[in-house]
């Protein structure tokens, strides 16, 4: 009897197709079918035409593997727990996209939870994910304060915790790139929209800015800085706090915002104040989210490779789980300055003109 007319012997009463169903259908052993479908080492000794028969039968019979049962047998779930501060903002979305891409390519799954700045949820979610059998954790823009029970990689965690690998941007180098760019364009009075205090990147990024400003001889005026302290991840946040700085009527020729999404909002506030970008006020952001290139004008920004950071995090946690590589406490990521149309030479007559400053060579790497 041909396979196209053979009855499904060994089929379960619920109609679900199992390895035994396929084995009986092809007059093969379940072990042979399993080896082919799992592409195990044993399959290397199986003739090619037999492999093709198994794969064709699996497609024809609509076979769906039971990953949960497989994980119980092998004591593996191939599942990672991802704990993020936000998943709807461009930063978190791009990092998680990189995580997903690498995990998918390596036959891992992931469960994602979002704590929205509620520290009490971190422990709850950690325990919940462990109860569901995750083999490791990746945190995104979340401070890990205690040693984890499972392999853990933190993207922008900024905490030195034993057993946790931190993937961090070189914020001092990033600040050097941004401020040196503005300095060389003649900007001396620069306004700053500082990041929210609950964001794990905020303190390191601001410390880098202050250090580099001192190296350049730039004065950071208290009245030209404001800390954004609301739980918002839209351009409206940047618009609101840029309006606060503008209302102080202190002249400035450039504005450096904590991230791109708030920089885009700040551009709107500057324009609503009757000023032009970049002719009157240059604006620079941080991250290089996809929208930065399509803002009007195109946003100059410091790029941190968020997609690649997610991929590196996924690769690192898998390496730790499968003990492929030795533990490393920190992986440093280099930023890149992306110059677009939102920055230009400081030459606006309505603001206090700055005297020409002697050009100085400022190294891109911190001393």
Segments predicted by a language model, with ranges:
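Alpha-helical recognition/docking segments in bacterial nutrient-uptake
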Residues: 1-14, 18, 75-180, 184, ...
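N-terminal helix-turn-helix DNA-binding module of bacterial transcription factors
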Residues: 1-76, 364-367
């Amino acid at each position: 009897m041909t396979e196209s007319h053979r009855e499904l012997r060994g089929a379960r009463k619920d109609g679900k197709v199992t390895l035994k169903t396929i084995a009986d259908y092809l007059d093969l052993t379940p072990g042979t079918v399993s080896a082919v479908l799992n592409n195990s080492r044993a399959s290397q000794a199986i003739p090619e035409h037999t492999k093709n028969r198994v794969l064709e039968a699996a497609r024809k019979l609509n076979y769906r593997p039971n990953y949960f049962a497989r994980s119980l047998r092998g004591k593996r779930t191939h599942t990672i727990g991802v704990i993020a501060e936000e998943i709807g903002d461009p930063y978190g979305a791009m990092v998680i996209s990189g995580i997903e891409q690498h995990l998918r390519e390596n036959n891992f799954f992931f469960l994602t939870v979002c704590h929205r700045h509620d520290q009490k949820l971190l422990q709850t979610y950690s325990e919940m994910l462990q109860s569901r059998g995750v083999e490791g954790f990746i945190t995104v823009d979340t401070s890990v304060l205690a040693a984890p029970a499972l392999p853990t990689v933190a993207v922008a965690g900024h905490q030195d915790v034993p057993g946790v690998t931190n993937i961090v941007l070189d914020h001092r180098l990033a600040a050097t790139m941004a401020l040196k760019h503005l300095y060389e364009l003649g900007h001396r009075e620069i306004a700053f929209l500082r990041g929210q205090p609950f964001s794990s990147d905020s303190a390191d990024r601001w410390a880098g800015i202050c250090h580099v400003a001192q190296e350049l001889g730039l004065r950071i005026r208290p009245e030209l800085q404001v800390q954004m302290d609301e739980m918002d991840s839209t351009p409206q946040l940047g618009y609101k706090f840029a309006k606060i700085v503008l209302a102080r009527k202190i002249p400035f020729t450039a504005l450096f915002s904590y991230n791109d999404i708030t920089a885009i909002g700040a551009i709107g506030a500057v324009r609503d104040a009757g000023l032009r970008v970049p002719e009157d006020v240059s604006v620079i952001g941080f991250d290089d989210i996809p929208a930065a290139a399509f803002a009007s004008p195109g946003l100059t920004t410091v790029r941190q490779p968020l997609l690649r950071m997610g991929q590196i995090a996924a690769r690192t946690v898998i390496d730790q789980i499968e003990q492929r590589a030795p533990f490393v406490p920190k992986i440093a990521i280099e930023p890149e300055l992306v110059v677009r149309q939102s920055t230009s030479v400081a030459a606006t007559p309505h603001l206090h003109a700055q005297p020409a400053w002697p050009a100085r060579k400022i190294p891109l790497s911190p001393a």
